A protein has these predicted regions:
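Charged, gly/pro-rich active-site loop segments
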Residues: 2, 71-147
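Alpha-helix boundary recognition
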Residues: 12-15, 59-60, 94
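Charged, low-complexity, helix/coiled-coil-prone segments
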Residues: 1-4, 29-39, 132-135
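Short beta-strand segments
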Residues: 17-50, 55-59, 64-68
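Extreme N-terminal tail/first-helix region
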Residues: 1-20, 139-147
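Short secondary-structure boundary/capping segments
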Residues: 11-12, 36, 56, 103-105, ...
Length: 147
């Protein structure tokens, strides 16, 4: 099991938003791109055009990865509809990235992607010794391993 504080600290360290690299894969092709991401209730959200390659790849394979700072995030992604149908998302995105809302949220092909994390890892150093922290959401566990 885990200590609740381990997961609370994780979300504090991740914060409410960030520019993150989203990686998707289908047909043995991995692609990555930077996305403006908001973090709400332990999930990651971004918006994009539903006709873009990333959405076609997610339709074939919903397993995705995000990377930013010292964090790597593995998760399952799904299209939850248009930004206008997800007011909680538009409100959060508008606080962090107001230009993104004004430029793209009302476009007809725009959709919101929701990523539910399954595993998050982070490199940390304590007294110049490297460790990998792992939060496993499917097992509800936290571990810190010396490297």
């Amino acid at each position: 099991m885990h200590n609740t504080n381990d997961f609370e600290k994780l979300w504090q360290d991740i914060g409410t938003h960030g520019v993150m690299v989203l990686s998707t894969c289908a047909d043995n092709r991995v692609t990555s791109r930077s996305m403006s991401v908001t973090v709400i209730g332990g999930r990651f959200y971004c918006q994009t055009n539903k006709d873009y390659l990333k959405c076609r790849q997610i339709a074939q394979n919903p397993n995705v990865a995000l990377c930013f700072g010292r964090f790597t995030i593995e998760g399952v992604c799904r299209d939850i509809g248009k930004p206008c149908d997800n007011e909680f998302f538009v409100k959060a995105l508008g606080k962090a990235y107001p230009d993104a809302v004004s430029r793209w949220s009302s476009l007809p092909q725009e959709c919101v992607l929701e990523i539910t994390p399954t595993l998050i890892q982070s490199w940390i150093y304590e007294n110049d010794i490297p460790y990998i922290e792992t939060w496993d959401f499917s097992e509800s566990t936290y571990a810190k391993e010396k490297q």
